[in-house]
Amino acid sequence: MTHPFLFLKWLVEHFTQGTSLENLEHYGFLVHVTHAWLIMLLLTGVALLLKRRLSEVPGGLQNLVEIVLVELGRLADETMGPKGRRYFPLIATLALFILFSNLIALIPGFAPPTANLNTNAALALAVFGMTHVVGVREHGLKYFKHFVGPVWWLAPLILPIEIIGHLARPLSLALRLFGNMYGHEIVLVIFFTLVPLLLPIPMMLMGILVAFIQTFVFTLLAMIYIAGALEEAH
């Protein structure tokens, strides 16, 4: 998707003596990858800053982060149970990265990494891989017994269904997030191009809602998949 203006595009062209970002993309300098690294650096910087300034009486940013993490931890406990607490860092990292990747779309001149299918596919594959790692860690090789079902003579029928169902998970995670964020990005670009003042404001407010909803849906589904792997194999 062509943006009317990208801050990083201007920055690259300025410091590379007019080399366009489209030419640099052939060398791996992709817009969504650059913005994804920007989000990761931002989150890392905020985490290090909070670590240095931790206080028993939280205030400001620390208070906000604690509220978000406590509520997210409560949701994780309700969804995954006590065994799922060891996987909370993964869930929290996914939630924060996706949320900030969605919200950066509301800043003129920046493109959301989650509006690119490659970014979402990487996140979805990470959840997919971790789900089965959790299953094997908790149940050993017995984890794979649920792929063939409880009755052996139904295995030829159950096995393909289970495989298709599990492969559909990362596909649905990636496409759902991509479709919603890419569609919202198109609408924002159209409104900013046609009517750059006042009218895009309601769309930006809706964008905040979309960013939080999509973060919640992706994170909740990730927790549900991990919770399924944590359950006793049948």
Swiss-Prot record:
Q: What is the lineage of its organism?
A: Bacteria, Pseudomonadati, Thermodesulfobacteriota, Desulfuromonadia, Desulfuromonadales
The cross-references to SUPFAM superfamilies, in alphabetical order and at most eight, read: F1F0 ATP synthase subunit A
Origin organism of this chain?
Syntrophotalea carbinolica (strain DSM 2380 / NBRC 103641 / GraBd1) (Pelobacter carbinolicus)
Keyword Lipoprotein in the entry? The reply is no
CDD domains to which the protein is assigned, alphabetical: ATP-synt_Fo_a_6
> What topology in the membrane does the UniProt record assign?
Multi-pass membrane protein
- The principal location of this protein is membrane
Cite the PANTHER family for this sequence: ATP SYNTHASE SUBUNIT A, CHLOROPLASTIC
Name-wise, this protein is: ATP synthase subunit a 1
Q: How does it assemble?
A: F-type ATPases have 2 components, CF(1) - the catalytic core - and CF(0) - the membrane proton channel. CF(1) has five subunits: alpha(3), beta(3), gamma(1), delta(1), epsilon(1). CF(0) has three main subunits: a(1), b(2) and c(9-12). The alpha and beta chains form an alternating ring which encloses part of the gamma chain. CF(1) is attached to CF(0) by a central stalk formed by the gamma and epsilon chains, while a peripheral stalk is formed by the delta and b chains.
Recite the UniProt keywords alphabetically.
ATP synthesis, Cell inner membrane, Cell membrane, CF(0), Hydrogen ion transport, Ion transport, Membrane, Transmembrane, Transmembrane helix, Transport
Function description:
Key component of the proton channel; it plays a direct role in the translocation of protons across the membrane.
**Which Gene Ontology terms describe the biological processes this protein takes part in?**
proton motive force-driven plasma membrane ATP synthesis
- One matching Pfam family, short form? ATP-synt_A
Q: Does the keyword Transport apply?
A: yes
Q: Where in the cell is it found?
A: Cell inner membrane
User: Transmembrane stretches, by residue range?
Assistant: 29-49, 90-110, 116-136, 147-167, 186-206, 207-227
Q: Name one GO cellular component term.
A: proton-transporting ATP synthase complex
PROSITE patterns registered for this protein in UniProt? ATPASE_A
Regarding protein family, the annotation reads:
Belongs to the ATPase A chain family.
An example of a GO molecular function for this protein is: proton-transporting ATP synthase activity, rotational mechanism
**Cross-referenced InterPro entries, in alphabetical order?**
ATP_syn_F0_a_bact/chloroplast (IPR045082), ATP_synth_F0_asu (IPR000568), ATP_synth_F0_asu_AS (IPR023011), F0_ATP_A_sf (IPR035908)
Q: Which gene does this sequence derive from?
A: atpB1
